């Protein structure tokens, strides 16, 4: 799945000291978030779970792009933040966040395990129901670069 590109003048990710800082990822399909609104109001929990998995897929795709461009591989997920647009009565935000956590653990094994924050908000960009952002570490691939072995 190709990750959604930023709609405005910001970077999808930035690397500093082998850490990838990833911009917030929405569940865009063909450039658009298809189902908009708040979880349990306009969006079912099942649809929110589907969208959170898409967010995680986009995030992982950007991490792969960042790693490849820097001749590295993804080392580990350092932290994950999950945002859920919902009303104050909805108490299932952690269950939704579990879907993103499970995705990264499935992809990276123990290196996909991470600390996590989950936040309920009244509205997200483009009226999306869910969004994630994260930080991940990159590791140089083993090899000989400029006469040095890594």
Describe these PLM feature segments.
Residues 1-57, 61-78, 89-150:
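N-terminal presequence-like segments and the immediate start of the first folded domain
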Residues 79-85:
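Short glycine-rich or small-residue beta-strand-to-loop segments that form or flank ligand, phosphate
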């Amino acid at each position: 799945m190709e990750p959604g590109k930023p709609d405005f003048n910001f970077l999808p990710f930035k690397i500093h000291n082998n850490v990838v800082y990833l911009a917030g990822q929405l569940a865009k399909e063909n450039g658009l978030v298809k189902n908009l609104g708040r979880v349990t109001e306009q969006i079912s929990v099942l649809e929110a779970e589907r969208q959170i998995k898409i967010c995680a897929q986009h995030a992982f795709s950007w991490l792969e792009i960042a790693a490849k461009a820097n001749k590295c591989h993804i080392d580990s997920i350092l932290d994950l933040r999950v945002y859920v647009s919902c009303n104050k009565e909805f108490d299932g935000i952690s269950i939704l966040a579990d879907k993103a956590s499970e995705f990264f653990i499935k992809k990276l094994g123990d290196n996909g395990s991470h600390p996590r924050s989950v936040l309920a908000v009244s509205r997200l960009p483009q009226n999306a129901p869910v969004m994630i952002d994260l930080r991940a570490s990159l590791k140089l691939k083993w090899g000989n670069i400029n006469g040095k072995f890594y």
